């Protein structure tokens, strides 16, 4: 593999006209638990470097890794550099690397080793003294939730959560935020004992994507959309997150979690809340959270969960030109596992704006393509003067917000087919970020890490949102536990037949992304 292009010039500060990330972090340190995991290696370390490469991290920024590895400082530097070189999106720059490297530290130890935390406390104090981090430190817990209590206890025992004066101490938590409502509350109790809620940042990386943030801009900055954004005109809303891959090497994490807990509880319900919420009074974290919480608290489950939910497991077979294994044949998966790799549910939002409008949410692995989108499907015209036979089969306008890949918007509408007779077919008008703007969109983790370091929280779910999401999902999960094995579906398709039947009973069908 060719090494990336390396430059040696010290990078200049960001372009003053770059208004996408207009803030620079204060002097601070970031302590990573789980620094050797895939997420840190492929996403988090490159995101930190790319922020530094764009001049968005203070020169005093420091990065401390905490792991069991018996690494020397040089070993850790080599690991961080290799991760950055393999996954940076802004190109490797020796000047940026040298600045970042001078703030790297590594503490070897296990999560339950008190002596390791004392060494960590000494390292943090040394960084304050020689690096100038100013007593400002964030602790990134990229670890399974089962380890949170022991890590939190040791952070408290060593005083690492304590701050003085205007210093700050924060904690950044990766999903899942619990396994159900009860465990989510227990997890919150553990964290809240040592950190204030305002200092807790729960990462949902989908909320850092440019298109997700554009939902609010599109709705509230354009007079043409908001008047139509209601039950009078909207037939239904479909929110899809599909992957075309299997679980890979994540069997230990995925089995027992499943598609609903992994994706619907956080990503899809957050997307639904942003789509359905009312305009906030002010564009502040608390005002946005309040409006999202109102949506989640207004969600109503369907009466017949057997008819209006669906779950499945991908089977083995051919996908594209490759023969792939089924979920039960994957390494580390029990032969009798009932964990779903596909989940679809129908929900209602009982507000004046959305009364009677179904929200269909679906997610799965080994589906037809990798795509995440929100499709707002409008009602058919009440009357057309040239007869229904002239219309295409669907004859419904739709506004599709593409979250990934190819971020942008698509508007589907009817247009006359050239010729003498009146025939109307569906056509699309497309907006793509990559074509409309010359700037690259920041990677989601860049935005979220910077937000956490500067203390801005509009894109981080509050504990109240987490609990509201589990209140929605728990009854569905409890019902599924009584239903035995999930329905198998062929790889490369769009899920089990029960998911298609769910919409067919309503006289609708899933949009093909």
Task: Give each language-model segment a name.
Residues 1-173, 177-513:
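Secretory/organelle targeting and membrane-embedding segments
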């Amino acid at each position: 593999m060719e090494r990336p292009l390396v430059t040696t010039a010290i990078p200049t500060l960001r372009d003053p006209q770059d208004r996408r990330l207009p803030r620079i972090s204060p002097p601070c340190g970031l302590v990573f638990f789980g620094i050797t995991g895939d997420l840190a290696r492929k996403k988090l370390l490159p995101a930190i470097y790319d922020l530094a490469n764009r001049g968005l991290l203070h020169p005093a920024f420091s990065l401390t890794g905490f792991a069991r590895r018996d690494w020397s400082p040089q070993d850790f530097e080599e690991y961080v550099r290799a991760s950055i070189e393999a996954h940076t999106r802004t190109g490797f720059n020796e000047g940026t690397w040298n600045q970042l490297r001078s703030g790297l530290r590594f503490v070897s130890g296990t999560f339950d080793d008190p002596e390791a935390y004392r060494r960590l406390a000494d390292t943090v104090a040394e960084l304050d003294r020689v690096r100038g981090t100013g007593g400002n430190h964030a602790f990134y817990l990229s670890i399974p939730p089962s380890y949170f209590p022991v890590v939190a206890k040791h952070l408290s025992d060593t005083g690492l959560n304590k701050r003085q004066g205007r210093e700050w101490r924060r904690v950044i938590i990766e999903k899942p935020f619990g396994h159900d409502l009860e465990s989510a509350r227990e997890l919150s109790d553990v964290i809240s004992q040592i950190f204030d809620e305002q200092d807790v940042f729960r990462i949902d990386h989908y909320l850092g994507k440019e298109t997700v943030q554009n939902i609010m801009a599109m709705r509230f900055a354009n007079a043409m959309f908001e008047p139509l954004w209601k039950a009078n005109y909207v037939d239904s809303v479909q929110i899809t997150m599909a992957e075309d891959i299997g679980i890979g090497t994540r069997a230990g994490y995925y089995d027992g979690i499943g598609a609903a807990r992994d994706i619907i509880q956080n990503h899809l319900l957050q997307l639904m809340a942003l789509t359905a919420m009312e305009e906030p009074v002010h564009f502040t974290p608390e005002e946005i959270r309040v409006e999202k919480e109102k949506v989640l608290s207004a969600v109503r489950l369907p009466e017949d969960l057997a008819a209006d939910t669906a779950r499945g497991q991908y089977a083995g077979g051919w996908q594209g030109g490759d023969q792939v294994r089924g979920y039960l044949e994957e390494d580390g998966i029990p032969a009798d596992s009932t964990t779903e790799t596909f989940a679809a549910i129908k929900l209602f939002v009982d507000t004046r704006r959305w009364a009677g409008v179904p929200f269909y949410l679906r997610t799965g692995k080994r589906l037809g393509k990798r795509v995440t989108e929100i499709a707002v499907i409008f009602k058919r015209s009440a009357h057309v003067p040239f007869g229904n036979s002239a219309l295409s089969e669907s004859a419904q306008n739709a506004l599709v917000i593409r979250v990934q890949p190819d971020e942008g918007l698509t508007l589907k509408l009817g247009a006359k087919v050239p010729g003498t007779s009146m025939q109307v077919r569906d056509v699309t008008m497309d907006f793509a970020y990559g074509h409309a703007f010359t700037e690259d969109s920041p990677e989601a983790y860049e935005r979220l890490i910077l937000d956490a370091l500067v203390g801005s929280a509009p894109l981080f779910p509050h504990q109240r949102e987490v609990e509201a999401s589990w209140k929605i999902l728990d009854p569905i999960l409890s019902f599924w536990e009584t239903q035995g094995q999930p329905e198998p579906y062929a790889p490369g398709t769009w899920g089990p037949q029960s998911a298609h039947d769910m919409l067919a009973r309503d006289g609708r069908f899933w949009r093909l992304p």
